[in-house]
């Protein structure tokens, strides 16, 4: 299996692991795949973990990143791969002067893990993330779980409280299949 096929397979496993249905996966692949920045962690020449990120500006003019689909193959878990993917993505946004990161955990277990790596809960706030074509990108998420955020600089004091984050149409990145 070639590298690109391996990454696409990893992405499909990521969606399947949180119960995202096939029609959303197909729509996502067609519309959003090239708009996202993908972080991939390799173990040798095997893609062992993946995470996607969309950049946005919220209604207050603050710049953020939306993390989505963090997934590590089961045989590579508990080796720091997920933490490394998060760290790389945070460093990328920090260097580009972004304000915060937001994500919606898919389970109570993942919420505990995100807390361990520095994310905080947005108290009693449930958000929706809408893509540039109106697709709700929070499909497949446990809607009872609150969103979480990570501040990218010390003077960040505005906890994001928007109910809806809209992802603008973005240029495609170099990562294509």
Predicted regions and their residues:
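Conserved N-terminal entry element of GNAT/NAT acetyltransferase domains
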Residues: 1-5, 162-171
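Short alpha-helical
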Residues: 2, 108-109
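A conserved beta-strand-loop-helix scaffold within acyl/acetyltransferase catalytic domains
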Residues: 4-71
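Short hydrophobic/aromatic beta-strand or adjacent loop that forms the aromatic wall/cage
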Residues: 36, 142-147, 170-174
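Conserved acetyl-CoA-binding loop-helix of GNAT-fold acetyltransferases
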Residues: 72, 78-91
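Conserved GNAT acetyl-CoA-binding A-motif
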Residues: 93-107
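Conserved catalytic-core motifs of GNAT/GCN5-like acyltransferases
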Residues: 102-104, 120-148
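Conserved active-site tyrosine of GNAT-family acetyltransferases
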Residues: 114-119
């Amino acid at each position: 299996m070639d590298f690109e096929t391996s990454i696409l397979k990893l992405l499909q496993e990521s969606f399947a692991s949180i119960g995202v249905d096939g029609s959303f996966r197909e729509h996502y692949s067609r519309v959003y795949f090239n708009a996202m920045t993908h972080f991939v962690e390799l173990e040798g020449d095997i893609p062992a973990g993946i995470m996607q990120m969309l950049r946005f500006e919220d209604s207050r003019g603050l710049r953020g990143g939306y993390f989505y689909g963090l997934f590590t193959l089961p045989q590579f878990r508990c080796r720091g791969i997920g933490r490394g993917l998060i760290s790389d993505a945070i460093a990328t946004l920090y260097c580009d002067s972004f304000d915060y990161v937001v994500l919606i955990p898919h389970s109570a277990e993942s919420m505990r893990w995100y807390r361990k790596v520095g994310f905080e809960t947005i108290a009693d706030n449930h958000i929706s993330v809408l893509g540039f074509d109106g697709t709700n990108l929070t499909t497949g998420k446990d809607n009872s779980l609150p969103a979480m955020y990570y501040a990218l600089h010390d003077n960040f004091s505005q906890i994001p409280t928007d109910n809806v984050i809209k992802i603008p149409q973005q240029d495609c990145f170099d990562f294509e299949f």
